[in-house]
Regions:
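Feature captures the FAD/FMN-dependent oxidoreductase FAD-binding
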Residues: 105, 110-114, 162-210, 302-314, ...
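Iron-sulfur cluster-binding cysteine motifs and their immediate structural context
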Residues: 12-37, 58-86, 135, 173, ...
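A conserved FAD-binding loop/helix module that cradles the flavin
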Residues: 254, 390-415
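FAD-site-proximal beta/loop scaffold in flavoenzymes
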Residues: 216-240, 323-394
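Flanking helices and flexible, charged tails adjoining ferredoxin-like Fe-S electron-transfer domains
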Residues: 3-8, 85-107, 147-148, 152-166, ...
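Rossmann-like dinucleotide-binding cores of NAD(P)H-dependent redox enzymes
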Residues: 133-136, 140-176, 228, 255-302, ...
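Glycine-rich dinucleotide-binding loop and its adjacent helix/turn
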Residues: 88-104, 163-180, 205-261, 364-380, ...
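N-terminal Rossmann-like FAD-binding beta1-loop-alpha1 element of flavoenzymes
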Residues: 110-135, 250-259
Length: 605
């Protein structure tokens, strides 16, 4: 194996599993340490730099960071990263003086943002401080896109939503409400804008084209449209017996909303078994805690009407197996009629671009979607960019935020006549955490410590009012207990080869057997003869230069390390140190890092 290039920021970044998994690369360990220090405002602002909406995401994020959390190396449950984000948002002080501001003089460039969801708002957040005039076109009477229209208030209070949206709009963003764009060609032809960003989401709910659908139309609702109608006050009740078709997160929002609008017999109907559900595990748990019944292996076949009124649906009872090609095939076992007063369809979302003409230089590809470059977010027409769900279909808010950041970089470079593909690389700062010979300015308790359970509003109280937030959030005591579970994965081992005397002390003290000194070889073979076989090939092996006495190599399995620092504490020659890694993330208008190399390294005793 070749020695590991520790000058590459991606080496350290990959080891901070939570930050690596986050689409926006939020510095999770640092914001958790700030919470531990009671610095809630600083934690909030660190969050906001990358994910823009800490209060919103602290309640609604799909949490890609948590399955990656290194805490699961020592026990079953990850750190409650998402809920700690909410702690920072709930307990922060005033941040108005800390928010980015628009300069007094503009740069003369005008940007159109179609849609006011998280992607468009992020673009505005990044470009307005650079002097751009951003104009948002929103078809609805309020901003937020699907964050507003599709996430119920019992999960995301309107107060939290509007507070964080207003932080961006109050920079001086112009927004034109109730303004649906009917023709992109017309907008392009007006010459009013130097660049256009399309962030219209995936606004079209999928239909269920089966027998009786048209006849039952009055009592069959498209999930995302139904949730929007609830938010804007057009729907305030539902029938007692409700069937929700689908098992994604929208389906969970629909069934829980039905309970709060008068339904008392709510069933979620799934075509397949639980292992194929698309809903997040915690969304399923919340629904089932509210006594929602989920029926599996029920395939909808027919809406049943009597005397012009919907009475229920007929389902095929099925079982699933794989064919010779490994594809799932169903076998019908029978039929079942289930009563219903209302049916809500939550089986997916589609994009809709009837307003983008096909003769303006924008190519369309699979699923009638615009062809969008995955690095620059530009379409095949220069100056027109797409992000969020509008780019490649439905994803979570955090993905839309990252799309917005990347699109803002491209828009800025396009408007400054720079190449949109010439992007600043990530950088890093490395700072030693050493305070004394064997002391470090962080603590790391890798002993088992169970995840803190979320407290909920009383069931009767929350079901009585759709505006009552279900989750109460962590109190101070719970927050303290949960932050202690973080393993500080951004504080990483740093090895100096020429200081090593090959005494094996670090290997002896390592609690996870992640260190081995042995002769070199091909990686696949080396992985098999380490102290603990390194089976997870998605995590790198650290390989040192040849050691001075025996020419052996110090190997470290990054998958097993819990960042405890015992190797550095035990080492008699300081060959091991613990360095805090800070990923430098380029945003729109970012000046080059203060070094010609891709890293900026700082060491502090």
């Amino acid at each position: 194996m070749q020695p590991t290039n520790t000058q590459d920021p991606q080496y350290y970044h990959r080891v901070v599993d939570c930050q690596w998994a986050c689409p926006a690369h939020t510095n999770v360990p640092e914001y958790i340490r700030l919470i531990a220090d009671g610095k809630y405002t600083e934690s909030y602002m660190l969050n906001r730099e990358s994910n823009v909406f800490p209060g919103i995401l602290g309640r609604t994020c799909d949490r890609p960071c948590e399955p990656a959390c290194r805490r699961t190396r020592v026990e079953d449950e990850p750190v409650a990263i998402c809920r700690l984000k909410r702690v920072a948002a709930d307990l922060r002080g005033d941040v108005d003086h800390l928010l980015p501001k628009a300069p007094e003089s503009k740069n003369g460039k005008r940007i159109a943002l179609i849609g006011s969801g998280p992607a468009s708002l992020t673009v505005a957040n990044d470009l307005v401080p650079l002097g751009y005039e951003c104009v948002i076109f929103e078809a609805l009477p309020k901003a937020g896109g699907l964050m507003r229209s599709n996430i119920p208030s019992f999960r995301l209070p309107v107060r939290v939503l509007e507070e964080e949206i207003d932080m961006i709009l109050d920079m001086g963003v112009e927004i034109r409400y109730d303004h649906r764009i009917e023709s992109l060609k017309e907008m392009l032809g007006s010459g009013e804008f130097d660049s256009i960003f399309i962030g219209t989401g995936a606004p079209k709910g999928k239909e269920l084209d089966i027998e009786g659908r048209q006849e039952a139309d009055a009592n069959v609702h498209i999930g995302i449209d139904w949730l929007e109608s609830i938010h804007f006050g057009h729907i305030d009740s539902v029938g007692e017996r409700v069937l929700v078709i689908g098992v994604g997160n929208t389906a969970m929002d629909c069934c829980r909303s039905s309970l709060r609008l008068g339904g008392n017999d709510i069933k979620v109907m799934a075509r397949k078994s639980r292992q194929y559900f698309k809903a997040s595990p915690w969304e399923l748990e919340d629904a089932e805690d509210e006594q929602i019944e989920i029926l599996v292996n029920h395939s909808p076949q027919k809406f049943v009407m009597e005397n012009g009124r919907l009475t229920g649906m007929i389902f095929d009872l099925v079982e699933w197996d794989e064919d010779e090609n490994g594809r799932l095939v169903s076998k019908k076992l029978g039929e079942k009629f289930i009563e219903a007063d209302d049916v809500i369809l939550a089986i997916g979302q589609d994009n809709a671009f009837p307003w983008i003409e096909r003769d303006i230089g924008i190519e369309f590809g699979d699923w009638d979607m615009p062809v969008v470059d995955r690095a620059t977010f530009m379409t095949t027409r220069e100056g027109v960019f797409v992000g969020g769900d509008a780019a490649w279909g439905p994803e979570n808010i955090i993905w839309a935020v990252e799309h917005g950041h990347q699109a803002a970089i491209s828009i800025h470079q396009y408007c400054q006549d720079e190449s949109v593909t010439d992007r600043l690389p990530y950088g890093m700062n490395l700072v030693s955490t050493k305070m004394g010979l064997h002391e470090w300015r962080y603590s790391n308790d890798y002993d088992p410590n169970l995840r803190t359970e979320m407290r909920y509003e009383d069931l009767e109280a929350r079901l009585a009012d759709i505006f009552v937030e279900a989750e109460l959030g962590f109190d101070l005591k719970e927050s303290v207990r949960e932050v202690e579970r973080c393993l500080n994965c951004d504080i990483q081992t740093d090895f100096t080869t020429n200081l090593c005397i090959e005494c094996d002390a670090c290997i002896d003290v390592c609690p996870t057997h992640c260190l081995t000194m042995t002769h070199n070889g091909e990686e696949e073979e080396v992985r098999q003869r380490l102290t603990a076989v390194a089976e997870n090939t998605e995590q790198a092996l650290f390989a040192s230069e040849a050691l001075p006495q025996t020419a052996r190599i110090m190997f470290k399995d990054e998958d097993l390390c819990v960042h405890c620092g015992l190797c550095a504490e035990r080492c008699p020659t300081a060959a091991w140190d613990m360095m805090q890694f800070d990923l430098l993330i380029p945003y729109a208008g970012q000046e080059p890092w203060p070094t010609t190399a891709p890293t900026a390294s700082t060491t502090s005793a």
